[in-house]
Amino acid sequence: WADVDRAWMKIKTPIQIGHPLEYYEDHFRKAVALEWDIRLTNPKFAQNDHRVNKIKSAFAKIYSSFEPNTKSEEYKKIYDFSFKSLDKVQLYVGRPALFFGAEFNGMFSAQVVPNDEIVSLEEGKKIFAFSDEILQTSRAKPFLKLSREIFGQELLTKDRMFLFNETASWHQVYDISTVGHEYGHILWCDEQTESVMNKTGNFKNIEEFKATT
């Protein structure tokens, strides 16, 4: 399967095949199934360096704030490894075209793959994001009584106004919060981080908090 990942990483066309081993939960059967879908990349979100450069700038600022200590050399290796990893990321922002279980809507948000760190060391990672899909789904949702009781009608109305009337700003928020989260998975990790942390089973739990931060 590592060889499948290596071949898959070399597909860099606007039409992308979903990662063949990325699992999603099936809420109906309480099971998992192989993902195998086709995705179309939005030409408006072509590959560019502005996201990576901003992330590098912020990452460098945080790193430079560290006080020198006995682990400085180790931190520098992780810092350099993270920069090299960022340079190998392929970003695809688009929409699903064909996918298994088409009636099970809600699968698509964003993802970074593959999870094989040996392959990622060689080939990098792909980030998939589905901003148009999320926007359309969000706009289709009705007001819920529970939401109104918790947040109040005024906040829900402002949120709905933003959702429908400020499309460009909505995409910017998605870019920072969701695409930025996926890039965040790449920072502060080297080739051994996952295997070392998984000795106690803590990697995925801590990793999600780290990526969001």
Predicted regions and their residues:
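Extended hydrophobic-aromatic, low-complexity segments
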Residues: 187-188, 196-197, 207
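Acidic/His metal-coordination segments adjacent to aromatic residues that form catalytic metal sites
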Residues: 160-170, 192-202
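Contiguous, non-catalytic segments that form substrate-binding/exosite surfaces or channel walls
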Residues: 1-161, 170
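Alpha-helical scaffolds flanking conserved acidic
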Residues: 172-176, 205-207
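Post-HExxH zinc-binding segment in Zn-dependent metallohydrolases
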Residues: 202-213
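Active-site recognition of the HExxH zinc-binding catalytic motif
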Residues: 176-190, 211
